[in-house]
């Protein structure tokens, strides 16, 4: 059975509404409607759990301080003990995009004399961005000579220091509890909504707070993709294409298969997907029938989005304005 036939009769959202006035780099409010009864709760709860546990982020994973062998130590010239310094470092929120997958980064710091050690001091190059640079780490007096290395890694969820001890190779390295998740809070609400004369449909309102290293809309998109990939294992049948005439050659069959795909299979950016949702375009066949002028009517439209769509279509041998197929 084709996807179109499978979804026939289901009321489902065509687009997501963004509260552009209230949204910030750390907060986003999203509204989707209508859903069949029960679906808004299912989707809202699934998104919330995935957002809180499975979005990748960066955190400090281990430290090494010159002259210190364990966390129950004191450093000459530093007001805070090592335990307090570690607790403060655990609160640092970091944006780090490695050049290679799973690549960690070592930050080397040398702080001498009186002053304050703040999170912003960790931004030693352009690959590191500290989201809370004013966070206090330690207070140094004129006798201080703090030399330390910090390891930054990417990961998911919460990883306790105990789990990292087996991977420590350098003497004096102290593992740190890592809170990788950039999502700090997620709240969803399900309420009734009306479609024509029926008021038993549902509206999903989703609010997301992040530390700023990932925008709320990107976090939601990542969570949705993670859920989608986990659900594909439960699809144990193939989408069947409509019966075709024997005279259709292989190229025609390939074209029809491409046109019947959902637009999400183009692997578009969040902004481009929002353009398609606002125009109620669900399938590639619907997309190629539109002209470039029609696409510009979306409030989410930009030249960059149009260029991305044109490139994605061209890889399938398609383009805008195709009406005769």
Swiss-Prot record:
Q: Name one Pfam family in it.
A: RNA_pol_A_CTD
Task: Tell me if Manganese is a UniProt keyword of this record.
Answer: no
Q: Where is this region: Alpha N-terminal domain (alpha-NTD)?
A: 1-238
Q: Which GO terms describe its molecular function?
A: DNA binding; DNA-directed RNA polymerase activity; protein dimerization activity
An example of a Gene Ontology BP annotation on this entry? DNA-templated transcription
Q: Which domain of life is it from?
A: Bacteria
First and last residue of the signal peptide: none
Which stretches does the entry tag as region Alpha C-terminal domain (alpha-CTD)? Answer: 254-325
Keywords carried by this UniProt record:
DNA-directed RNA polymerase, Nucleotidyltransferase, Transcription, Transferase
**Cellular component terms (Gene Ontology):** cytoplasm; DNA-directed RNA polymerase complex
At the top of the EC hierarchy, this enzyme's class is transferase
For this protein, the Enzyme Commission number is 2.7.7.6
Catalysed reaction(s) here are:
RNA(n) + a ribonucleoside 5'-triphosphate = RNA(n+1) + diphosphate
Q: Which InterPro entries match?
A: DNA-dir_RNA_pol_insert, DNA-dir_RNA_pol_RpoA/D/Rpb3, DNA-dir_RpoA, RBP11-like, RNAP_asu_C, RNApol_insert_sf
Function noted in UniProt: DNA-dependent RNA polymerase catalyzes the transcription of DNA into RNA using the four ribonucleoside triphosphates as substrates.
Present the record's domain note: The N-terminal domain is essential for RNAP assembly and basal transcription, whereas the C-terminal domain is involved in interaction with transcriptional regulators and with upstream promoter elements.
Q: How does it assemble?
A: Homodimer. The RNAP catalytic core consists of 2 alpha, 1 beta, 1 beta' and 1 omega subunit. When a sigma factor is associated with the core the holoenzyme is formed, which can initiate transcription.
Q: Which family does it belong to?
A: Belongs to the RNA polymerase alpha chain family.
Mind telling me what this protein is named?
DNA-directed RNA polymerase subunit alpha
Organism per entry: Leptospira interrogans serogroup Icterohaemorrhagiae serovar Lai (strain 56601)
Gene name in the database record? rpoA
């Amino acid at each position: 059975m084709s996807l179109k036939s499978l979804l026939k009769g289901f009321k489902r959202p065509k687009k997501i509404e963004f509260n552009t006035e209230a949204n910030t780099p750390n907060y986003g409010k999203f509204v989707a409607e209508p859903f069949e009864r029960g679906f808004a709760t299912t989707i809202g709860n699934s998104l919330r759990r995935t957002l809180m546990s499975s979005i990748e982020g960066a955190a400090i994973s281990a430290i090494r301080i010159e002259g210190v062998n364990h966390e129950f130590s004191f450093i000459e010239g530093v007001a805070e003990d090592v335990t307090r310094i570690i607790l403060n470092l655990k609160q640092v929120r970091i944006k780090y995009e490695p050049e290679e997958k799973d690549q960690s980064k070592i930050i080397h710091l040398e702080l001498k004399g009186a002053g304050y050690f703040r999170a912003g001091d960790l931004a030693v190059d352009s690959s590191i961005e500290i989201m809370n640079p004013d966070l206090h780490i330690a207070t140094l007096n004129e006798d201080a000579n703090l030399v330390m290395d910090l390891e930054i890694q990417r990961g998911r969820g919460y990883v306790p220091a105990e789990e990292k001890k087996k991977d420590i190779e350098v003497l004096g390295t102290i593992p740190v509890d890592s809170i990788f998740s950039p999502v700090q809070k997620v709240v969803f609400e399900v309420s009734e909504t009306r479609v024509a004369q029926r008021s038993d449909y549902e509206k999903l309102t989703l609010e997301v707070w992040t530390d700023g290293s990932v925008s709320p809309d990107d976090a939601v998109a990542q969570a949705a993709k993670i859920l989608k990939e986990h659900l594909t294992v439960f699809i144990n049948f193939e989408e069947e294409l409509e019966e075709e005439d024997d005279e259709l050659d292989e190229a025609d069959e390939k074209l029809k298969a491409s046109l019947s795909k959902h637009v999400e299979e183009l692997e578009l950016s969040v902004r481009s997907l929002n353009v398609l949702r606002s125009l109620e375009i669900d399938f590639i066949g619907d997309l190629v029938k539109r002209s470039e002028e029609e696409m510009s009517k979306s409030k989410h439209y930009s030249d960059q989005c149009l260029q991305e769509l044109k490139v994605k279509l061209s890889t399938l041998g398609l383009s805008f304005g195709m009406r005769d197929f």
